[in-house]
């Protein structure tokens, strides 16, 4: 177990003090995009510095497809295999720096709601996420996952370009 790290907190700039770090559990919403990979690197650095652990949460968008499309299960299985390989790569990096990491994969249609639900039920102290993901133009029409998460989250959110 890493030694307890200190963090500076301030009521205002004239009233600052060092206390035990409140960063214990960092969530990285992850889609294997370059943005989420960079977010993971920031989370890894913070976890190492503060003695926190990381949960990497991948919520693969469950498309509502017509029932006549037979190959959705095959597509979902391929997505799952790709994400499992990514999780292995992230776990290896965390192990190298002695950071505890957990991975979780969900197949859902409500991405932001599932991120927020996970945060609330798992004592997450910080979310580190990319400013963009793999969503493309369709996701832009419905709003940014990063923006919605940062506006609704009960904890600090770090957005990484």
Where are these regions (language model features)?
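Short secondary-structure boundary segments
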Residues: 59, 130-132, 161
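Intrinsically disordered or low-complexity boundary/linker segments at protein termini
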Residues: 1-37, 152-161
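Glycine-rich, Arg-bearing micro-motifs that act as flexible, cationic patches
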Residues: 126-152
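Acidic, proline/glycine-rich short linear motifs
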Residues: 2-16, 58-85
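General small-molecule cofactor/ligand-binding pocket signal
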Residues: 55-57, 102-106, 158
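Short, hinge-like loop/turn segments at secondary-structure boundaries
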Residues: 71-75, 120-122, 145-146
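Small/aliphatic-rich secondary-structure junction motif
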Residues: 16-70, 95
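Structural beta-alpha unit
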Residues: 1-17, 21, 92-127
């Amino acid at each position: 177990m890493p030694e307890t790290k200190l963090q500076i907190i301030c009521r205002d700039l004239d009233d600052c003090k060092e206390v035990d770090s409140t960063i214990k559990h960092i969530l990285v919403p992850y889609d294997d995009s370059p943005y989420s990979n960079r977010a993971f690197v920031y989370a890894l650095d913070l976890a190492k510095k503060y003695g926190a652990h990381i949960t990497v949460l991948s919520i693969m968008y469950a498309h509502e497809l017509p029932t006549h499309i037979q190959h959705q299960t095959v597509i979902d299985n391929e997505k799952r295999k790709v994400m499992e390989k990514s999780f292995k790569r992230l776990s290896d990096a965390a192990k190298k720096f002695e950071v505890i990491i957990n991975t979780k994969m969900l197949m859902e249609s409500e991405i932001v709601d599932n991120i927020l639900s996970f945060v609330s039920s798992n004592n997450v102290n910080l979310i580190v996420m990319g400013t963009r993901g793999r969503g493309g133009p369709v996701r832009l029409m419905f709003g940014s996952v990063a923006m919605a998460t940062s506006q609704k989250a009960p904890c600090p959110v770090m957005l990484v370009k």
